[in-house]
């Protein structure tokens, strides 16, 4: 059973944003809100983290002061190539491996069969493995409520198995393979156990890119 979702809830666990003080903070007025039409109520808040052994990462959050609309993204400020990062979570300390996920990043939780893909409502975040599991858990709980209303007992049973597996991963009792892939190089896993490699052109083509558009050199119209 594969669950695909754009997850917008809080990250849960211990976030990198809570561990590291931002080096720079900037607030920009953007004008009117596209959701509620509030005049001059939309603003962007930007701050920069310097993550050890990785570099500078900017978190940008757009907020409406009137209706509460909120959307976030993460941008790595140093030029990076399209990459795949992978780590095997085997013990509790692995839960603190850092996760930088931009709107263009795809996260796979292999043993759970869960894929978090980019989409119109996707948000970027800086967190850790535990935070990603909490996000997945929240989506599964929402799906469980929906399936209960439909009286789909088999789906509820399968979701309960996934929720149990997540708790066992957090307790260090079950393994979990975590991958993050980003065609723009704006996402990463950061830790000693993490393995990474450059994405192939075929892998890049297959990835969902959300609100972003990629133009291949051979697709540019001739003048």
Curated annotation (Swiss-Prot):
Keywords: Metal-binding, Zinc, Zinc-finger. InterPro entries: Znf_ZPR1, ZPR1, ZPR1-like_arc, ZPR1_A/B_dom, ZPR1_jr_dom, ZPR1_Znf1/2. The keyword Metal-binding applies. A zinc finger (C4-type) spans 33-67. One of its GO terms (molecular function) is zinc ion binding. It holds the Pfam family jr-ZPR1. NCBIfam families: zpr1_rel, ZPR1_znf. Belongs to the ZPR1 family. This is Uncharacterized ZPR1-like protein PH1223. It comes from Pyrococcus horikoshii (strain ATCC 700860 / DSM 12428 / JCM 9974 / NBRC 100139 / OT-3). The lineage of its organism: Archaea, Methanobacteriati, Methanobacteriota, Thermococci, Thermococcales.
